[in-house]
Amino acid sequence: MPTSHENALQQRCQQIVTSPVLSPEQKRHFLALEAENNLPYPQLPAEARRALDEGVICDMFEGHAPYKPRYVLPDYARFLANGSEWLELEGAKDLDDALSLLTILYHHVPSVTSMPVYLGQLDALLQPYVRILTQDEIDVRIKRFWRYLDRTLPDAFMHANIGPSDSPITRAILRADAELKQVSPNLTFIYDPEITPDDLLLEVAKNICECSKPHIANGPVHDKIFTKGGYGIVSCYNSLPLAGGGSTLVRLNLKAIAERSESLDDFFTRTLPHYCQQQIAIIDARCEFLYQQSHFFENSFLVKEGLINPERFVPMFGMYGLAEAVNLLCEKEGIAARYGKEAAANEVGYRISAQLAEFVANTPVKYGWQKRAMLHAQSGISSDIGTTPGARLPYGDEPDPITHLQTVAPHHAYYYSGISDILTLDETIKRNPQALVQLCLGAFKAGMREFTANVSGNDLVRVTGYMVRLSDLEKYRAEGSRTNTTWLGEEAARNTRILERQPRVISHEQQMRFSQ
């Protein structure tokens, strides 16, 4: 007789295969996740297991048997130059070759979403192969390439980088993105005041007004951590080493930790250190399975051909729910202050970020770049209820954009593997994109690592790091979607009422289970 567990598994699988809104490829993806999550979890200490079961720590539904890294950032330049013995490909000689080679390799780059989350620093990669092509000839090819990416790899966690330099490829990508207004690929422009021309940054601002992309990264800040050109911005704004990536992402629910604390002092001296240690134990267990039991790094041609290096993968030490944690702790101390409203509460938040950063910097991990994890302000997942993503301000009553940026900026110094705050601006900004440029430059001057904006009235909007069309959400439940992340946006709309709020959307990363 089938056990209750077997019956539950069959019911979940039956729900997937009979779903009227999933494509066959999407059904296959979710069925594979159910199979993986039916396997035993890597062995954990009792306290770490309890924290995971109680929801104080969340493993992002990555799966019980991590047989591939969460995020992979291949050295695409090496691939274009040398080709691949495994794929029986010669190196590229012109732009057509380069685009063709990339479209082939993308299908062999694994990730937590089963699609590539990093497409490369595309303008730097492709510009050497332009040769004698005119701008019009480049534009035609890039637009065709852009459409191909969205139609064959329909996952909005897929992420391309451009900048900081100007080039015909850079301009062609910006034009294609503004014209096509696609959900994927996502796009980050890396800004460097010593390199980026003013008119290029203005063009980037115009694109944001048009399609809420690209996200803008503060290049010099990232260069200090990874070296110039030694990193990529992927998925939901995770900054990671190039030719490596992110092995796993586990996150602390700071709200739940605050609920288990008797006072502010108890939080900082007992509960937060305790759960930080449990999170490291989970990270180590997951990475040990990936490195020692999955055989991924032993068998992948990406390793054998020098496109990735196992020593350049880093686990991400995530957190979320800072706003709720601060408010709870202030209540316990009798402090009449709210996060994002009063300086006393904001200072508690900064202290939490500083203590997390100190812990991560001083705590070795078994497997990882420089033997350390990297701190990440995680942007939430679609099923989160009652918590604010990362270190963001609570939704619904945010201050004006300048005050908002000044409030969150101090956190950015601590989160080396990514932190983001989404500003939603009135659509009147479209008449003055230079104001958007000044807002971005002011944010970077204040110390922010990233600048991200949605423009009210646009159909294409950002849900944390990835994009969805609001029009797609309305028809998804009836018709389904060819884009793998539309259902996430739809679930976020139900769970968080994002469509009922002022022009601003919640952020979340991939939820690794299907629910109708």
Swiss-Prot record:
It comes from the Bacteria. One of its GO terms (biological process) is anaerobic respiration. Gene3D superfamilies: 3.20.70.20. To H.influenzae HI_0521. This is Uncharacterized protein YjjI. The gene is yjjI.
